[in-house]
Amino acid sequence: MKDRFSLVAIAMAGALSSCGVPAPSLSLLSAECDVQFSSGDVVRSQDVFFMASSMADCRKPELRFAPFRSNALSYGFVTPKGSEDEPWKTHDAKLLRKSDWVETLLRQVARPGANKELLVFIHGYRNDFHDGLQRAVTVRNLYPYAVPTVSIVWPSRKRYLGYIYDASSIGWAQAHIDRLLRTLVQGTDNITLVAHSMGGRALIGAVERLNLEDEAAASRIRKIILVSPDVDRDRVLRDKGSVEALLHGGRSVTIYSSHEDFPLRTSRRLHGYSRLGSSDCRYSVNYEERDRGRYGECHLGPDLPGLSIVETSDAASGGFNRHSDVFDTCIGRADLKAVLTDEPTPWRERVEPRDGRTGYRLTRAAYEAERGDCPD
């Protein structure tokens, strides 16, 4: 049933891609955004910074972002406005001038208690400004202390059938993300990059370019985490593949994959070969592995220092989508927290190595035996 739905979705996405994206309305284009600007002096430690290449929508008192591309980049911050129990249920976004944004962010990084760390999050397919913010907050809250956080927002159409639009837009946004990363590495020497889904494409591209342009600055990126990355698996894990660039300079690189990820199954049908965020063997470039089937654990990668590739299928979040299990389950968040804070991960099992390639799997039973809590 899922496979039939996947084929229908692909056919409809292909048909819709020929329609093109309509132009923004005149009211959106002419809306005045000056009233949305604030000052960096009011930014608090719990606020989240953002850089958006989506078009700012200033037609209402609340700042929003429309699913259109904009070369007029928006820099700003978001303040939680919800209750004490659910502070991020509602929020207030404000713009900053770029120079004020950079200065305020670096001041937050340098403040006592922040450990001079910076977290950068890139959202994925079918996620808008709000979705990206919520994921960034989920990751940020796993730290035991307040870490300055930047949510990078690119113009997703936020539709199941908008896959081709989104794939095109993340490629279009690449140059903007590259430039932002070059700015950020000048101000701190301890950066963690986290990307979800299609966001992994931009993360990998930005790191590869920065390695080539400024190796010393690139070394300030200490950790890279790819959650359900919608990227060609062989391109990353093969000999001399992108994983070597990601690990360059002694970085820690963690990749989460699953054989239950439905959007990545659809992506594989569009691209023809396995995705990095999938452990399914049936469409591997290593053709002899294909007989291992869907459950053959083909997420294994080269045995390199700093690299962990983790199969997450046992971290079931419910429903059929399963594209965000790492964020949506207790064991997924616990493992992510351990990576962020350099803690042990006793709930991981090491997969039997094959041809010099290694990896892990999450085991819910081991987690429940080890811990009874659920990281927020």
Model-derived features: positions:
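Bacterial N-terminal signal peptides that target proteins for export
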Residues: 1-8
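Alpha/beta-hydrolase fold active-site loops
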Residues: 117
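C-terminal motif of bacterial Sec signal peptides marking the signal peptidase cleavage site
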Residues: 15-18
